Amino acid sequence: MPPIYLASASPRRSALLQQIAIPHQVCVPDVDESRLAGESPAEYVVRLARAKAQRVWQHLPPDQRRPVLAADTTVSLGNDIFGKPQHRSEAVAMLQRLSGVTHQVFTGVAVYHAGGLEHALSVSEVTMRQLSLAECEAYWHSGEPQDKAGGYAVQGLAAAFIREIKGSYSGVMGLPLYETSQLLTALGWSLGQAADDSDKLVVKGEFCV
């Protein structure tokens, strides 16, 4: 199976693709991630996923074009979007707002291929237990929240904060595997049939466009 392109710098998304044995090469797109006025969380992540996939596809030489997979994830409480915290106080404020309540995690996933651009949307509900200020501060100092939407990683230390998830665990991580597999199999890709050697699932030579 030839590798697809993964339009993401996220090691979590790469690891999730490896989990379902999809060989891929990482290509990091330069896309403005600002939210448009009046844009819902669902519209936001779908637009960004599509934009990332399209940007990579358009920069590939015609003889190197293979399907491009992209995704975008955001955490939402009501209509407020929580991106990646830039500093300690922002991360702590995010966690305090998420403490003891149920929020939504939206992940848009898109595939650009020779036949066009397809996308899917995963929406999950995550309920956190009550968090103390000291826990929020300590979690920031663990180094884990810095590059995570909503300021937490469900697969990391923050797993101890999560009381319940309704939806897609992999979607909360950043790449919903069910929706991803549906998009790829629709293109004729056979999941799980890649090389036995897992080291061959990630093609060396990450690049940016």
Positions of predicted regions on the chain:
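Anionic-ligand binding patches
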Residues: P2-Y5, P41-V209
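Short glycine-rich, Thr/Ser-proximal phosphate-binding strand/loop in the N-terminal lobe
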Residues: A21-G38, L117-V123
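Short loop/helix-cap segments at secondary-structure boundaries that form the rim of catalytic
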Residues: A15-Q19, L36, P62
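N-terminal beta1-alpha1 ligand-phosphate binding loop
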Residues: P2-I22
